């Protein structure tokens, strides 16, 4: 599943933008990108550029502000109780995502990495950008790794960059999603309670 606005209530890059004093500017770009109005790669690079000069200590402060979506931890526990694996794919950043994953007990994580020199963010990414295509590829790879048929996979997300994985999964769910994503998804949840996903999964 996606992390920002899905597993958690916030958009991590917006929180980082607030720390950099450019919160409103970053949030506007995020909103347009998630609606599919902007090229995601270009929008991400633009927002990351605004974070240049931030100290790496910002990641601990940012994680402290993160709250899990209602039902998120219960969904992970419920999945594990059935012997299922849970992975997250995010256009956000490993520096915060890894802390979220550890707190939630999630099995796999794919996210972006921010470049830092001498403890300061450079405003650039340290590796290839996680795109809608790479989210889909990662879902396919994890299914193969776990020996799970695609018909038995689940994908949950809210943004335009989640559409390919949502459509490819055996059960694809738009969660409190942007209109474009909701229209493209086989299933949709409009209430901020991730445990509702389990009802869909078990019914589908």
Regions inferred by a protein language model and the residue ranges of each:
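C-terminal cap/substrate-recognition subdomain and adjoining C-terminal extension
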Residues: 61-204
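A structural signal for alpha-helix termini and helix-coil/disorder junctions
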Residues: 22, 35, 50-54, 65, ...
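Hydrophobic alpha-helical segments
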Residues: 16, 23, 28, 50-53, ...
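Short, flexible segments with low predicted structural confidence
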Residues: 14-15, 32, 44, 50-51, ...
């Amino acid at each position: 599943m996606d992390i920002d606005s899905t597993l958690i209530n916030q958009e991590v890059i917006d929180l980082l933008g607030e720390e950099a004093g450019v919160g409103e500017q970053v949030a506007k770009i995020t909103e347009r990108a998630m609606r599919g109005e902007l090229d995601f790669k270009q929008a991400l690079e633009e927002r990351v550029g605004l974070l240049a000069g931030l100290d790496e200590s910002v990641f601990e402060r940012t994680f402290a502000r993160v709250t899990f979506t209602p039902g998120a931890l219960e969904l992970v526990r419920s999945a594990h109780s059935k012997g299922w694996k849970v992975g997250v794919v995010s256009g956000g950043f490993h520096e915060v995502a890894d802390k979220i994953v550890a707190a939630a007990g999630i099995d796999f994580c794919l996210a972006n990495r921010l470049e830092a020199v001498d403890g300061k963010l450079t405003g650039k990414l340290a590796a290839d950008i996680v795109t809608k295509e790479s989210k889909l590829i990662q879902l396919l790879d994890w299914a193969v790794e776990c020996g799970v048929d695609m018909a038995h996979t689940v994908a949950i997300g809210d943004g335009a960059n989640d559409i390919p994985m949502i459509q490819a999964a055996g059960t694809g769910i738009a969660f409190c999603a942007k209109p474009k994503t909701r229209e493209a998804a086989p299933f949709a949840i409009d209430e901020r309670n991730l445990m509702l996903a389990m009802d869909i999964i078990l019914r589908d």
